[in-house]
């Protein structure tokens, strides 16, 4: 990190967050263009990403984002469900335009389409799943930033942020760090203070699993007799009698 001024070097907490979120864990394979971002290979075959390179690219990407005068001209996209919440929160804090879910083909190239837009910068969570917007951005000369794993192909990617883009915690942390750095550069928050927003706000949550977890916890906490009473108690049925003649 000697190429950075002391103020721009990552704090120990930032490195610990990356390790806790497994940002450094790559895949079993490595693309030839991603070899320079790897540190070593573990005995189990997984490549380890060099977090110093990750931090450098976060710094570079944040400065590119700040250079865009109108933040609404920045499009942030994630077709991957694990990155959709992070994309929405990131766009909300920096003022960008978020596209979560399926990307409509022709959004950047088909002018007769109702959703046609001309962004000045594109940010994607996965170059593989977000291949369509990356391809369209290359047609119309839109610079791109992407979260890239060791197996990611960098075709159409101008700035690759090496990280684990397969885990929800790692994706959330990358967008959180990028948003915080943008706010630092804009002067929205002082660099010597801690950002009040927690990483947890960016982490994907499965809304379908929450009711099931609550139900399971309630059943486990309730006494067995109470559960049996709830499940098997039946209202008494009045006896039928023939009407008097």
Swiss-Prot record:
MF GO annotations: structural constituent of ribosome
Record's keyword terms, sorted: Cytoplasm, Ribonucleoprotein, Ribosomal protein
InterPro entries: Ribosomal_uS2, Ribosomal_uS2_CS, Ribosomal_uS2_euk, Ribosomal_uS2_euk/arc, Ribosomal_uS2_flav_dom_sf
Coiled coil feature spans: none
Keyword Ribosomal protein: yes
Subunit and interaction comment: Component of the small ribosomal subunit. Mature ribosomes consist of a small (40S) and a large (60S) subunit. The 40S subunit contains about 33 different proteins and 1 molecule of RNA (18S). The 60S subunit contains about 49 different proteins and 3 molecules of RNA (25S, 5.8S and 5S). Interacts with ribosomal protein S21.
Gene3D superfamilies linked to this entry: Glucose-6-phosphate isomerase like protein, domain 1
Listed name of the protein: Small ribosomal subunit protein uS2
Organism: Dictyostelium discoideum (Social amoeba)
Lineage, top ranks: Eukaryota, Amoebozoa, Evosea, Eumycetozoa, Dictyostelia
């Amino acid at each position: 990190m000697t190429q950075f001024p002391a103020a721009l070097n990552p704090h120990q907490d930032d490195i610990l967050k990356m390790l806790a979120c497994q940002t450094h864990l790559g895949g079993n394979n490595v693309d030839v263009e991603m070899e320079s971002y790897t540190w070593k290979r573990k005995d189990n075959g997984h490549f380890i990403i060099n977090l110093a390179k990750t931090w450098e690219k976060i710094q570079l990407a944040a400065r590119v984002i700040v250079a865009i005068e109108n933040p609404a001209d920045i499009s942030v996209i994630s077709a991957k469900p694990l990155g959709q919440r992070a994309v929405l929160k990131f766009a909300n804090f920096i003022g960008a335009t978020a596209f979560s879910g399926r990307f409509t083909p022709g959004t950047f190239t088909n002018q007769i389409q109702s959703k046609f837009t001309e962004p000045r910068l594109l940010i994607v969570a996965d170059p593989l799943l977000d291949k369509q917007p990356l391809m369209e951005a290359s047609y119309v000369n839109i610079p791109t930033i992407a979260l890239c794993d060791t197996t990611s192909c960098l075709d159409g990617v101008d700035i690759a942020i090496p990280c684990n883009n397969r885990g929800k915690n790692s994706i959330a942390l990358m967008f959180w760090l990028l948003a915080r750095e943008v706010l630092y550069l804009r002067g929205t928050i002082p660099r010597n203070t801690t950002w009040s927003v927690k990483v947890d706000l960016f982490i994907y949550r499965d809304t379908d699993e929450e009711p099931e977890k609550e139900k399971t916890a309630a059943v486990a906490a309730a006494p067995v007799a109470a559960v049996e009473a709830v499940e098997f108690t039946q209202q008494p049925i009045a006896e039928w009698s023939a009407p008097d003649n």
